[in-house]
């Protein structure tokens, strides 16, 4: 597969992942599927916008750049080899790095939140974090320490786990595009197939 075709494939995969990341982060603002009257009762990590910024917005731009490579024919700008493919592939590499950093941010925020557990109303009548060092992950009986919002533990655990997986996949895809983009920049893309009268690598 040509490096441009590979980039387009990666871009098409990143778009739905970014959308799912956005949705997962938005749902975290409704712990247990309920509206919270006091925003301070939400877990701190929800406000870090890992899914909205990291896996969402910062991933949309690289994905669009990767998909935009389909507008560059493999001869550059209609036979002008000086503009087009190599520069486009180099630019996609820079955006892939941005995407990797965004996905990494979302991945780290999600991992920290999963280990920390959700903020909830505890038996002592205060709001806080009843779990320590991910102990609730091994002992589901501890989940009862969170009295409100109801089902906040599985809610946060599920959504942050989704963000963790999405962030991990996005990091891998962006890393692949960094390598792919460098290959496209240094070695050129596919052989031209008669487009604009050209016949050779760009």
From Swiss-Prot:
The chain crosses the membrane at residues 10-30, 49-69, 94-114, 159-179. It is a multi-pass membrane protein. Residues 31-48, 115-158 are extracellular. InterPro entries: L6_membrane. Pfam families: L6_membrane. It comes from the Eukaryota. Residues 1-9, 70-93, 180-202 are cytoplasmic. One of its GO terms (cellular component) is membrane. Glycans are attached at residue 156. Keywords: Glycoprotein, Membrane, Transmembrane, Transmembrane helix. It is found in: Membrane. Regulates the adhesive and proliferative status of intestinal epithelial cells. Can mediate density-dependent cell proliferation. Belongs to the L6 tetraspanin family. PANTHER family: TRANSMEMBRANE 4 L6 FAMILY MEMBER 1-RELATED, TRANSMEMBRANE 4 L6 FAMILY MEMBER 4. This is Transmembrane 4 L6 family member 4. It comes from Mus musculus.
């Amino acid at each position: 597969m040509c490096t441009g075709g590979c980039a387009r494939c990666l871009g098409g995969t990143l778009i739905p992942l970014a959308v799912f990341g956005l949705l997962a982060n938005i749902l975290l603002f409704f712990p247990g599927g309920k509206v919270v009257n006091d925003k301070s009762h939400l877990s701190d990590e929800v406000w870090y916008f890992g899914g909205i910024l990291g896996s969402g917005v910062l991933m949309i731009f690289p994905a669009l750049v990767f998909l935009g490579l389909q507008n560059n024919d493999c001869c550059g700008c209609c036979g002008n080899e000086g503009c087009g493919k190599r520069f486009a592939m180099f630019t996609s590499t820079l955006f892939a790095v941005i995407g990797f950093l965004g996905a990494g941010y979302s991945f780290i925020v999600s991992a920290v939140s999963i280990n920390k557990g959700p903020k909830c109303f505890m038996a002592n009548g205060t709001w806080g974090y009843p779990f320590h060092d991910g102990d609730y992950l091994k002992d589901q009986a501890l989940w009862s320490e969170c009295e409100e919002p109801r089902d906040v533990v599985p809610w946060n655990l599920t959504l942050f786990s989704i963000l963790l997986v999405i962030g991990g996949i996005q990091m891998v895809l962006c890393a692949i595009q960094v390598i792919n983009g460098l290959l496209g920049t240094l070695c050129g893309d596919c052989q031209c197939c008669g487009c604009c009268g050209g016949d050779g690598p760009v």
